[in-house]
Design a protein with these regions (language model features):
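ATP-grasp fold ATP-binding core
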Residues: 118, 143-164, 182-201, 206, ...
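A conserved helix-loop-beta module that forms one wall/lid of the active-site cleft
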Residues: 93-160, 179, 183-184
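Short amphipathic alpha-helices in soluble, non-transmembrane regions
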Residues: 176-178, 345-348, 393-402
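Glycine-rich active-site loop/lid that clamps phosphate-bearing ligands
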Residues: 335-366
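ATP-binding N-terminal substructure of ATP-dependent carboxylate-amine bond-forming enzymes
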Residues: 1-104, 135, 363-378, 386-419
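A short beta-strand motif that forms the metal-chelation/ATP-contact edge
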Residues: 208, 279-288
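Active-site "cap" helix and flanking loop/linker of ATP-utilizing ligase/carboxylase catalytic domains
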Residues: 2, 249-271, 276, 286-343
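Conserved ATP-binding module of the ATP-grasp superfamily
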Residues: 124-127, 147-150, 164-200, 231-237, ...
Length: 420
């Protein structure tokens, strides 16, 4: 019996590519790699089984897949990030494959449309105001006071998200977000600037899989570090969550509700929420899995990799993840604290020797130009740890991080060391 064939949309600079390809190999899935790379370069490099597609033009990409594969249609086309999810939806629709529609995916990917979706579902949501690029920001009257949050409608994670505490910071924050969008070609035309109420409370995340319109929760994460701004730097994720059962249930129900209402009925979802007392307010629900290398922390929780879970579902195989171990696990994302040219991370041997540390992956490469938030779109690396409790995991991650030093060369060429 032939292996199921799957088209994977792999951004050329994604952390996740290798983990998805490894999972596919382990499951015996025949993968056709599709990348946003030049056709001529792909041929020159001798990349086999690869489609070079324009990820910024989903309709054209879908036509190219049909032309190149002919009647040998795959069982599914799967994206591994935000942009890939939208492209995959368009390709699946044109090929007649069963999947979430492009409209369903777009409703979740756009943060303004997501807020309207929450309101339609009568779920807690902050007030939000969109505005056009030519609007006089200094004359803008908000229906709510400070603090507020300025953010782009279509960038992922914390990129371009800025807390504003007083009126004289407002114009600068909006200008900053506009500048970020001008330099982000993939969303520049389709993204707007949003201003919304700041939400107090702790921040948490959910990893799940929609199966037949029902949410299957794979993990709930706590974020021990306060996310209060002015920029919202992701650092530590730990699980299992310490949230009360009724709060967890509210979080899960809200995620399922908005997914069903949008029409996202199948596939991975990653959700973020603010929790203030018993009130759960979703920040976003993305039709993709968790970003970076963070998924690696879930192998203990699931008994297999998250990528294997996603691929099992994509090819129509039922799954029953079984935890490989009890206890707690976590990841720390190493943020960029100074802009410049990345050189190296020091203290790695000492950090890896901290009891409970499982691995440290430095993903930045020597010579990479790096930027801190709000412009940042990448991390320097990831620390993974496990222990008996989430608190112990958090302490382990902090101890390992404290031994590291980051050397970043300013663009002028003078070395500077940033110690975590």
């Amino acid at each position: 019996m032939p292996s199921p064939q799957l088209v994977l949309l792999l951004p050329k600079d994604s952390y996740r590519n290798e983990d998805f390809l490894t999972a596919a190999s382990r499951l015996g899935v025949d993968v056709i790699q599709a990348k946003n790379q030049c056709h001529q370069l792909a041929d020159y490099w001798g990349l086999e089984q690869m489609l070079a597609l324009p990820f910024d033009d989903p309709q054209r990409a879908a036509r190219m897949v049909r032309e190149q594969l002919g009647d040998a249609l795959p069982v599914a086309v799967l994206g591994v990030d935000d942009q890939g999810a939208e492209v995959a939806a368009a390709i699946n629709q044109i090929l007649g494959l069963s999947a979430n529609t492009p409209e369903a995916v777009a409703q979740l990917r756009d943060k303004y449309r997501f807020r309207k979706l929450q309101m339609e579902c009568r779920l807690p949501a902050p007030q939000v105001v969109p505005f056009a690029g030519d609007e006089d920001v200094s004359a803008m009257k908000l229906p709510f006071g400070f603090p507020c949050v300025v953010k782009p409608s279509r960038l992922s994670g914390s990129r371009g998200v800025i807390r504003v505490d007083m009126s004289d910071q407002f114009v600068d924050a909006v200008d900053c977000v506009k500048t970020i969008l001008r330099h982000e070609a993939s969303v520049a035309e389709s993204s707007s600037v949003l201003v919304e109420q700041y939400l107090p409370g702790s921040e948490h995340a959910l990893e799940g899989l929609m199966v037949g319109g029902r949410l299957r929760v794979l993990a709930l994460f706590d974020k021990p570090d306060p996310m209060e701004g002015p920029y919202f730097e992701e650092t530590i994720y730990v699980c299992p969550s310490g949230l009360r059962a009724e709060v967890q249930s509210s979080f899960e129900q809200q995620v399922e509700t908005v997914c069903r209402h949008a029409g996202v009925l199948e596939g991975p979802v990653h959700a973020e929420a603010r929790i203030d007392g018993a009130t759960v307010t979703l920040l976003e629900v993305a039709p993709r899995s968790i970003g970076g290398l963070c998924a690696r922390m879930l192998r203990h929780t699931l008994g297999m990799t998250l990528e294997e879970v996603i691929l099992h579902h994509a090819i129509g195989q039922s799954i029953d993840p079984a935890p490989a171990s009890t206890g707690a696990t976590g990841v720390m994302m190493l943020p960029v604290e100074a802009g410049g040219v990345f050189d190296r991370v020091t203290g790695l041997d000492a950090a890896r020797a901290v009891p409970g540390v499982e691995s440290i992956e430095i993903t930045a490469r020597k010579g990479d130009r790096v930027q801190p938030l709000p412009e940042a779109s990448t991390y320097l690396g990831f620390i993974f740890a496990s222990a008996n409790t989430p608190d112990e995991v958090t302490a382990t991650l902090r101890q390992a991080d404290a031994t590291l030093g980051v050397v970043i060369n300013p663009l002028l060429g003078v070395d500077t060391t940033v110690v975590s």
